[in-house]
Amino acid sequence: MVQPQYGVLVHGAGWVAGEHIKAFQKNPHTRIVALSSRRMESVVQRANDFGMTDIGMYTDLEKALQHKGVDIVSICTPQHVHAENVIAAAGAGKHLVIEKPIANSLEEIRAMRDAVRQAGVKTVVSFVLRWNPLFSTLKNLIAQGAFGNIYYVETDYQSNIASWWAGFSEARLKEKGVSAMLVAGCHALDAARWFAGPEQDKAARVTEVFAYCGGWRKGCTREYNYYTGEWADNRPPLEYEGLEVYMLKFENGALGKVSANYDCIMPYTFPIEIFGDRGTVKDNRIWSHLFPGQKGWIEIPTILPTTADVGHHPFQGEIDHFVDCILNNRESHCNLEDAAHTHEIIFAAQQCYATGQPVRLPIL
């Protein structure tokens, strides 16, 4: 039986778009048929980078969506335009790969969710670490009961995000970035949900949030570049706090703590701790009842989430999973509906900052 091949439009021509293009080019069921972005020179450059000549090139999403043969749209634009992009693509009947964060407000998420539900299209959101080999291994072990019932999860996103990142000029702004947890810390929040869930392909839901924000970088024009090890003055400052710490109560009774820390003076790290009543995880080290007489930590020799470089992130696994979902008419465990809950937690924390009180979910 001949399997279908899906045409792909990649909307956005930045750093992460290149990783989407690579993944679609390697999947046997997809081919890039069009690229679009705000500037034509960026579109042309991306096409040249990946040897694509016979494709449509656009600066207008509406026109790009009309390009013949587009079945899937990858949204790789800045976060503050994701909502309008997703609504337009869903309205055109296209399946969607959506970069995180998906939106900048609960209102935008509701509108996106309504558009996707009405269109009946498939979606996946790029909480791409779910396909990291360590994450996959730990999730399998959790589902097998290697650590018993999970009662506490702790995850942290620690990255000195600053002007070395091309997206910082917009993401640092309160209006366009909103918060450290939304821009990038959401990876750690999604990880906490993923590991707190005992089922193989399901993340746990949160029922209550309490949060603090602080740190030192908000409004500060002095910044550190951990790639060069140098300090610089007169840099554009963050308009929101660089540190956020969440306390979470999960629906299944587990507790969690998640932080996003842009203010750290060190290389990128992504610490993971998972505690069960029959075992424990500390990053890639495990202690489990499966190993009677265990005298020391067992280290899993696999790829860890050790860099913010998107070239290190497992986009191929995400794209292959999503194409398989389309082929077999099933929903992704990381679809828009699921990812909306991760974002809902972030906006609940924003409410907590305003009131100083825990916030009960749902609020979406």
PLM segments and residue spans:
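Beta-loop-alpha module in the N-terminal Rossmann-like domain of NAD(P)-dependent dehydrogenases
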Residues: 55-115
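C-terminal helix-rich "cap/oligomerization" subdomain common to oxidoreductases
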Residues: 1-2, 30, 41, 72-74, ...
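Predominantly a Rossmann-like dinucleotide-binding segment in NAD(P)-dependent oxidoreductases
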Residues: 129-237, 356
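N-terminal Rossmann-like dinucleotide-binding module
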Residues: 1-51
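Rossmann-fold dehydrogenase core element
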Residues: 111-128, 148-155
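Hydrophobic residues in well-ordered beta-strands that form the structural core
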Residues: 98, 104, 123-125, 154, ...
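Contiguous beta-strand/loop segments that form the cofactor/metal-binding neighborhood of enzyme cores
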Residues: 2, 190-289, 316-330
